[in-house]
């Protein structure tokens, strides 16, 4: 099983720590599948550094969303990669 690491801004990282955020939506520009380990590392955009805090999850399910979903990411990147929805458990 693979280990995938991604940045997460402090306001979202806090939600993860409190258990209020278990579903992750990401640009599908990387490979991930059920059973992989997904690591979110807190990234502070003000100082452009990692804070040292991280949380590891086991990926329970991955759903790739169709390219026509418009939202958080630029449309050209969604069209190119699609999006992932990952159900995570600690």
Describe the predicted segments one by one:
Residues 26-29, 89-90:
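A structural micro-motif recognizing beta-strand termini
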Residues 62-90:
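Glycine- and charge-enriched low-complexity intrinsically disordered segments
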Residues 2-22:
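Short, basic/aromatic beta-hairpin or loop at an interaction surface
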Residues 48-62:
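Short beta-strand-centered aromatic/proline hotspots
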Residues 29, 43-48:
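Short, charged beta-turn/beta-strand-edge "cap" motif at the junction between a beta-strand
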């Amino acid at each position: 099983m693979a280990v995938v690491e991604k940045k997460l801004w402090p306001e979202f990282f806090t939600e993860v720590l409190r258990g209020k955020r278990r579903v992750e939506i990401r640009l599908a520009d990387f490979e991930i599948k059920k059973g992989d380990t997904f690591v979110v590392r807190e990234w502070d955009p003000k100082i452009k550094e990692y804070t040292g805090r991280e949380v590891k999850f086991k990926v329970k399910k991955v759903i790739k969303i169709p390219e026509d979903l418009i939202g958080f990411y630029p449309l050209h990147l969604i069209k190119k990669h699609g999006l992932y929805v990952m159900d995570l458990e600690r």
